[in-house]
From Swiss-Prot:
Sulfotransferase that utilizes 3'-phospho-5'-adenylyl sulfate (PAPS) to catalyze the transfer of a sulfo group to an N-unsubstituted glucosamine linked to a 2-O-sulfo iduronic acid unit on heparan sulfate. Catalyzes the O-sulfation of glucosamine in IdoUA2S-GlcNS and also in IdoUA2S-GlcNH2. The substrate-specific O-sulfation generates an enzyme-modified heparan sulfate which acts as a binding receptor to Herpes simplex virus-1 (HSV-1) and permits its entry. Unlike HS3ST1/3-OST-1, does not convert non-anticoagulant heparan sulfate to anticoagulant heparan sulfate. It catalyses: alpha-D-glucosaminyl-[heparan sulfate](n) + 3'-phosphoadenylyl sulfate = 3-sulfo-alpha-D-glucosaminyl-[heparan sulfate](n) + adenosine 3',5'-bisphosphate + H(+). The gene is HS3ST3A1. Changing S218A: 23.3% loss of enzymatic activity. Its EC number is 2.8.2.30. Substrate binds at residues 166, 184-190, 215-218, 255-259, 283-284, 367-370. Changing K194A: 99.5% loss of enzymatic activity. This is Heparan sulfate glucosamine 3-O-sulfotransferase 3A1. Residues 44-406 are lumenal. Residues 1-24 are cytoplasmic.
Length: 406
């Protein structure tokens, strides 16, 4: 038999060589796929765990939760890595992202907050309430562990427009057990047909022991609002910030004037017939200040003990005192005290030494503290006479003399 030729020998030696190369290629491919899988798992883990880290630091409130080693808006607790059992749950959750609150409506409470440089007063800033305060959840780690939930509000600031509702809400947000929507939901007056599920979804997440709040000052003058809120929960606590109705009306007009400089004068809008001294109660700036009339609708659905009436004047002169009453009413520990405030002489009202989650002073923005136009003294006198009987009735109904007729 003839010995194998060169071609046959080459074919025989090439076969084991090709099998060896194939096995090496397969091994490298498996190693590459395994490495990619491990990298993917690690990347997913890092993304999931990034929430607590991001939540511990930050700049402006709109861009993210501000902080200084604590988590904004919640109990001041240090973030620690979860136990092994909790890590497993944590890995199954999507990466947490902040939700911006809905844009505020044009209802007269558009005030923003200004962040000041330490030692300065009235400096412009970049964070705000309403449209610019981010809903940074309290205890981000706890929320990532599915320990927080969205609840319907247990307390609502229902009024009044230009009474000081924005200031009250922002002061309350300093409290670690208060979680509030920054923007005004306007659910019970404009969006009721969207349903309670939609309303609940607007709320920030809360932990056990925390209170969910919102404020929409137009509720107080909305006829349907009392019945609608009662239908949601008869136990809802209601807060009304009231102010001298004459001053409130002028402030209301001043705000409108800043947006529409071509409107008639305050004096011409106040009277149906100035000669006869007949006040035009259909003008909203006047109508809102008839507090006793609006309160009657609320008392048909809520007992007076479930309503707290906050003085807008005292909120300026003694913010800590009024906040003490509010905290008691809400069943909260008195954490907000004098140490949280300083009086800004330039603006003429108190500011927070430390706003929610910030290490710098915050004041209500440029839209607050506008200079009021000069109003005819005779018009002011007639307005005071008009409001006096309504004020006296309001004092009797609430059991509190606000001193607007002194």
């Amino acid at each position: 038999m003839a010995p194998p030729g060169p071609a046959s020998a080459l074919s025989t030696s090439a076969e084991p060589l090709s099998r060896s190369i194939f096995r090496k290629f397969l091994l490298m491919l498996c190693s590459l796929l395994t490495s990619l899988y491990v990298f993917y798992c690690l990347a997913e883990r890092c993304q999931t765990l990034s929430g607590p880290v991001v939540g511990l630091s930050g700049g402006g409130e709109e861009a993210g939760a501000p902080g200084g080693g604590v988590l904004a808006g919640g109990p001041r607790e240090l973030a620690v890595w979860p136990a092994a059992a909790q890590r497993k749950r944590l890995l199954q959750l999507p990466q947490w992202r902040r939700r911006r609150p809905p844009a505020p409506r044009d209802d007269g409470e558009e005030a923003a907050w200004e962040e000041e440089s330490p030692g300065l007063s009235g400096g412009p800033g970049g964070s705000g309430a309403g449209s610019t305060v981010a809903e940074a959840p309290p205890g981000t780690l706890a929320l990532l562990l599915d320990e927080g939930s969205k609840q319907l509000p247990q307390a609502i600031i229902i009024g009044v427009k230009k009474g000081g509702t924005r200031a009250l809400l922002e002061f309350l947000r300093v409290h670690p057990d208060v979680r509030a929507v920054g923007a005004e939901p306007h659910f019970f007056d404009r969006s009721y047909d969207k349903g309670l599920a939609w309303y609940r979804d607007l709320m920030p997440r809360t932990l056990d022991g925390q209170i969910t709040m919102e404020k929409t000052p137009s509720y107080f003058v909305t006829r349907e609002a009392p019945a609608r809120i009662s239908a949601m929960s008869k136990d809802t606590k209601l807060i009304v910030v009231v102010r001298d109705p004459v001053t409130r009306a002028i402030s209301d007009y001043t705000q409108t004037l800043s947006k529409r400089p071509d409107i008639p004068t305050f004096e011409s809008l106040t009277f149906k017939n100035r000669t006869a001294g007949l006040i035009d109660t259909s003008w909203s700036a006047i109508q809102i200040g008839i507090y006793a009339k609006h309160l009657e609708h609320w008392l048909r659905h809520f007992p007076i003990r479930q309503m707290l009436f906050v003085s807008g004047e005292r909120l300026i002169s003694d913010p800590a005192g009024e906040l003490g009453r509010v905290q008691d009413f809400l069943g909260l520990k008195r954490i907000i005290t004098d140490k949280h405030f300083y009086f800004n002489k330039t603006k003429g009202f108190p500011c927070l030494k430390k706003a929610e989650g910030s290490s710098r002073p915050h004041c209500l923005g440029k839209t607050k503290g506008r200079t009021h136009p000069e109003i005819d003294r005779e018009v002011v006198r007639r307005l005071r006479e008009f409001y006096r009987p309504f004020n006296l009735k309001f004092y009797q109904m609430t059991g509190h003399d606000f001193g607007w007729d002194g």
